[in-house]
Amino acid sequence: MSAGGAVEPGLPAAAAAPSAAPARDPGPGHLFRPISAEDEEQQPTEIESLCMNCYRNGMTRLLLTKIPFFREIIVSSFSCEHCGWNNTEIQSAGRIQDQGVRYTLTVRAQEDMDREVVKTDSATTRIPELDFEIPAFSQKGALTTVEGLISRAISGLEQDQPTRRANEEAVAERIDEFIAKLKELKQVASPFTLIIDDPSGNSFVENPHAPRKDDALVITHYNRTLQQEEMLGLQAEAPEEKPEEEDIRNEVLQFNTNCPECNAPAQTNMKLVQIPHFKEVIIMATNCENCGHRTNEVKSGGAVEPLGTRITFHITDPSDMTRDLLKSETCSVEIPELEFELGMAVLGGKFTTLEGMLKDIRELVTKNPFTLGDSSSPGQTEKLQEFSQKLDQILEGILKAHFIMDDPAGNSYLQNVYAPEDDPEMKVEHYKRTFDQNEELGLNDMKTEGYETGLPAQR
């Protein structure tokens, strides 16, 4: 059953009028401030707007903010003092991500209903057990909870029921039965599955067990189809042909992009690098002159390997922290002693040292907004402090631990200081990928031979 009509009542929030109340300066180089209840300078911009309910002037408040560990968003709230109508929504202010994202959550307990959810306009929400779907662009973006998503769908289905009962009583009865099923889900009498599929990659579902792995939540990153690219207003660019005499291995290429920290225009340098005893990779480094943020990312310069690679390294000495490390986008990281797992695509591709990778993990976990401030619980804070202490002990060489890199594409690498001899503390395994791993890499439907057959004849 589709919930195309499951939209909150009312028309779009407002039609902006020319007059606007002045807002405080968010600070040099930072248009989007991190969301914080303690930041007194973070004030909304007030704009006098036309109320689409009574056609008199109301007030729209816009707050440009950034959720740490996530994206920039615009929170808007409209209220009309004349008729009392109000409306709130959020919009993603960040860039469309390189890949789409699919969150599959198995709801087993009432605690799962309280998970924070960021759902953008382009996200599709499904509950397979009820054959229920909220299509993309049928609802405004929302910062809510799992229970809030279901309540919003119920409200959308109930809003036209009086009219249906008068004109189509049979249809209204079926919708009443379906609404009752949705209300039963809120009681979590039995487990059900919630899927949020966002081609833009800007939706988010909270992991309340961070920094530990969430067994109830599966996050899948995927490449968009041409139809999804068109739906998002993106235009695929054809790859440029490279002249035969051109050799870019000794050149540093430059192109314009946006800073991932402040979203200001920045310049990215790109170069092909040959890693000893491994393969060729592409290193991209961005330096923002506006806010001073620096970042680097690594892309594989070759194809997907025939076999996946799992590298298990036993950290026994502080000198191990200096080993070079290449983590591709398809590589997951696990530290069993900390019960910690870093999924694919998190942190992106990186060419750093083992010490740099562990510090990035610590920064990633400690800046999780749902473990900070008023939204955190004492138990979460204690777990986070214990995790940080153990990670510091590993960095200082006090605590021995295993560092596992699992890359189904086989494009990750950890330096062997004994090369070409074997490293006694490192185990490298090559394995055959599963069907699901090939599906995630887009290999199952790839046709490399005989693809010319079946194509329409050219005139």
Swiss-Prot record:
Q: Which GO terms describe its biological process?
A: apoptotic process involved in development; axon development; Cajal body organization; cellular response to epidermal growth factor stimulus; DNA endoreduplication; DNA replication; microtubule cytoskeleton organization; mRNA processing
The residue ranges flagged as biased composition, category Low complexity, are 1-29
Q: Do you know which SMART domains this protein is assigned to? A: Zpr1
User: Which chain segments does UniProt annotate as zinc-finger regions (C4-type)?
Assistant: 51-83, 259-291
Question: What Gene3D superfamilies does the record tag this protein with?
Answer: ZPR1, A/B domain (2.60.120.1040), ZPR1, zinc finger domain (2.20.25.420)
Q: Where are the transmembrane segments?
A: none
Q: What GO molecular function annotations does the UniProt record carry, in alphabetical order?
A: protein folding chaperone; zinc ion binding
Q: Which GO terms describe its cellular component?
A: axon; Cajal body; cytoplasm; Gemini of Cajal bodies; growth cone; neuronal cell body; nucleolus; nucleoplasm
Q: Name its cellular compartments.
A: Nucleus; Cytoplasm; Nucleus, Nucleolus; Cytoplasm, Perinuclear region
Q: Where is this region: Disordered?
A: 1-43, 438-459
Q: Which UniProt keywords apply?
A: Cell projection, Cytoplasm, Differentiation, Metal-binding, mRNA processing, mRNA splicing, Nucleus, Repeat, Zinc, Zinc-finger
Top-rank lineage group of the source organism: Eukaryota
The answer, when asked if Metal-binding is one of the entry's keywords, is yes
Main location as per UniProt: nucleus
**Assembly information from the UniProt record:** Component of an import snRNP complex composed of KPNB1, SNUPN, SMN1 and ZNF259. Interacts (via C-terminal region) with SMN1 (via C-terminal region); the interaction occurs after treatment with serum. Interacts with elongation factor 1-alpha EEF1A1; the interaction occurs in a epidermal growth factor (EGF)-dependent manner. Interacts (via zinc fingers) with EGFR (via C-terminal cytoplasmic kinase domain); the interaction is negatively regulated in response to epidermal growth factor (EGF) stimulation and EGFR kinase activity. May also bind to the PDGFR receptor.
Role description:
Acts as a signaling molecule that communicates proliferative growth signals from the cytoplasm to the nucleus. Plays a role for the localization and accumulation of the survival motor neuron protein SMN1 in sub-nuclear bodies, including gems and Cajal bodies. Induces neuron differentiation and stimulates axonal growth and formation of growth cone in spinal cord motor neurons. Plays a role in the splicing of cellular pre-mRNAs. May be involved in H(2)O(2)-induced neuronal cell death.
Q: Which family does it belong to?
A: Belongs to the ZPR1 family.
What name does the UniProt record give this protein? Zinc finger protein ZPR1
The organism encoding this protein is: Bos taurus
Q: Which gene encodes it?
A: ZNF259
